[in-house]
Design a protein with these regions (language model features):
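Phosphate-group recognition and catalysis centered on beta-loop-alpha active-site segments
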Residues: 1-330, 336, 364
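Short, ordered coil/turn segments that flank beta-strands lining enzyme active or ligand-binding pockets
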Residues: 115, 342, 370
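Beta-strand-rich structural segments
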Residues: 332-343, 367
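Serine/threonine-rich, repeat-prone extracellular segments and beta-strand-based repeat modules
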Residues: 344-368
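Short, exposed coil/turn segments at beta-strand boundaries within extracellular/luminal domains
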Residues: 370-381
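C-terminal low-complexity, Ser/Thr- and acidic/Pro-rich disordered "stalk" regions positioned immediately N-terminal
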Residues: 380-398
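A cross-kingdom C-terminal cell-surface attachment/processing module
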Residues: 404-423
Length: 425
């Protein structure tokens, strides 16, 4: 699903809200002037649309190529595959809580339907692999299923603890008041699954918090028909002609989430150019997650979301003191900024100017800050001007630190942004 926002609509928070639900955002720039172009890039949107000279956008990206280490314009998704699936029992509430508390942006869960039409969270159709019981979920009532406990992790090793088999009610009760989204995989082929699922979504007010994923194309079609406000991703992908794949996805009105074995720069770019954000599964470790980020992957389903929670996610600000207008002209100008990790840890540092615009009584700025992994870009920030006659304000108040030009690097990791030149008339 592709959404085109005006530049006034496209602040970082709005773009992230939409794209974290796997909806691709492009921004219609107000102009092709330098600040508007860089603000469009910093919004994190996957595409820029201009009526102006596209060479200005190309020039902005040319500046990125030489930047050491790369810079992210958007925060990739830290999707916790079956919770924290090696430390805790697989698909258990304990694992879900641990992942959320450690910085997962999404939970990836699996669901089946019981004999009495209750949705339970479990990967396999049978209880035997992960629990201390046996039996096919579809042929058992919820009461029968709840006699048993989850005792194994994703590696099929006993954890030494027992966990209740979660229901959709328990999952939704936990998630609905938190800033956590769900990649909800439909494992069941039951024809009434989607109707039960819809009732639960609306009962718990989860309409904005779910992306459906499935290998079952019949269920994906049912979701798009009966729960049209949910976006759905097909987990199937074959290395057929890319044009046929895109045509099929568009015909069925779904997106795609592919096995990470298919990660190729050309494929990622081809999908992104056609409005499909790059999402892949399932990465094993934090190191793999870092590699995925540098490879340009946005939706990163992984088994190590707790450790990945320590990775730098975004820049945030405290209260910024007024700054003399003349100080913005210094190549060594910086402002205080916090690097915030997925787990909420904040580290204070200095951000250099990526872009500056004089708005009369105040300045609009975009900052870039190093994190030790990659650099991050801020949203557009308003900074009040201080009086030029006020000697108490010095360059040190504005900050001093290393600054190299007005750089931005999306690298392969940050985003493959499409620039369109619209024809008039």
């Amino acid at each position: 699903m592709l959404l085109v926002l005006s530049q006034r609509q496209a602040d970082k928070e709005t773009v992230n809200f939409l794209q974290s639900r796997m909806k691709t955002v492009w921004v219609k720039l107000e102009s092709a002037e330098e600040f508007d172009v860089k603000a469009g890039i910093a919004s994190g949107a996957f595409g820029l649309v201009t009526d102006g000279d596209p060479k200005n956008i190309a020039q902005a990206y040319a500046e990125l190529d030489g930047l050491k280490g790369g810079t992210l314009s958007r925060s990739p998704l830290n999707v916790a595959h079956r919770g924290d699936p090696f430390k805790y029992n697989e698909n258990s509430m304990e694992g879900f809580r641990a992942a959320c508390e450690a910085g997962a942006t999404h939970l990836e869960v699996d669901a089946h339907l019981t004999k009495d039409d209750q949705i339970v969270i479990m990967h396999d159709a049978d209880l035997s692999r992960t629990t201390n019981g046996r039996g096919n979920i579809r042929s058992m009532t919820l009461e029968e299923i709840r006699q048993y406990k989850i005792i194994r992790n994703l590696g099929n090793m006993t954890t030494g603890s027992e966990s209740d088999i979660p229901t959709i009610d328990e999952l939704f009760s936990y998630c609905r008041d938190k800033e956590i989204l769900i990649f909800f995989e439909i494992k069941s082929s039951a024809s009434d699954f989607v109707s039960v699922f819809k009732r639960k979504i609306e009962e718990y007010g989860m309409e904005d918090n779910i992306v459906v994923i499935s290998f079952d194309r019949t269920q994906l079609s049912a979701v798009r028909e009966h729960i049209p406000y949910l976006w759905a991703l097909d987990l199937n992908y074959t290395k057929e002609n890319i044009g046929k794949t895109i045509t099929d996805l568009c015909t069925r009105g779904v997106g795609i989430d592919m096995s990470y074995g298919n990660v190729l720069p050309q494929l990622t770019r081809s999908m992104l150019d056609r409005g499909f954000p790059p999402a892949y599964w399932t990465y094993s470790t934090k190191t793999d997650v870092e590699t995925a980020i540098r490879d340009g992957v946005y939706g990163i389903t992984n088994n190590d979301a707790v450790a990945a929670g320590a990775l730098p996610e975004k820049l945030t600000f405290g209260e910024l003191a007024p700054v003399k207008k003349s100080e913005f002209l210094s190549e060594e100008f910086t402002l205080p900024v916090f690097v915030e990790s997925y787990d909420g840890t904040r580290t204070e540092t200095r951000g250099a100017l990526y872009a500056y615009r004089d708005a009369g009584e105040y300045a609009e700025v975009i900052l870039r800050a190093e994190t030790g992994k990659w650099s991050l870009l801020s949203d557009v920030v308003r900074v009040e001007y201080a009086s030029e006659e006020n000697s108490a304000s010095s360059s040190e108040d504005g900050g001093c630190g290393s600054f190299v030009g007005l750089p931005f690097a999306c690298a392969a990791a940050a985003g493959l942004v499409l620039v369109l030149k619209r024809r008039r008339g």
